[in-house]
Amino acid sequence: MWKLSRSRVLLDEPPEEEDVLRGASPASAAAQAPGASLRGWKEATSLFNKDDEERLLETSRSSKSKGTNVRLKEELKAEKKSGFWDALVLKQNVQPKKPDQMEGWEPPKLTAEDVATDHTEDGISSLPPWSAWEDDTKGSTKYTSLASSASSSRWSLRSAGKLVSIRRQSKGHLTETCEEVE
């Protein structure tokens, strides 16, 4: 797109005018340019004071010295307060703790009724809860091998029952949503 517009601009302007401007004296070129008169220059320079110029020059000179740079950096650090984003950065760097490692956290206590309803929902009421497996893994971050445990058949039956109940729930949920769509 730039090449097209650039070529159009070059084609629109005849090359002879450029030669005329190059060969002309600077005074005649300034006279042809809009706002380049002596009056325009005086108006532009009257906007600025000598005091402004000196102040700007002093700040540019002082920032080049090493001592002032060190002081400026220290002042910026002192002025900088912990803001909203700084708090978020600090929170992200903190590793989350497991619930059982936190102070004051206790696992929920199940009553006999909760355990009974849990077993009847799964259809497996003869199997004991998973408390033996939880005791073995408490405090460790590694996975536990269920095949090496003494009652591996119990765990496989328990997990199979859980999977069946999950599948039934998800299939029932999907069929309800499909009927609603139609």
UniProtKB/Swiss-Prot annotation:
Family, as annotated: Belongs to the TDRP family.
Name of the gene encoding the protein in the UniProt record: Tdrp
Name listed for the protein in its UniProt record: Testis development-related protein
Listed Low complexity bias regions: 22-37
Keywords, sorted A to Z: Cytoplasm, Nucleus, Phosphoprotein
Chief location bin: nucleus
Compartment(s) of residence: Nucleus; Cytoplasm
Comp. bias (Basic and acidic residues): 49-58
Record GO biological process: spermatogenesis
Keyword Transferase applies: no
Keyword Phosphoprotein among UniProt keywords: yes
Modified sites of kind Phosphoserine: S7
GO CC term, one of those recorded: cytosol
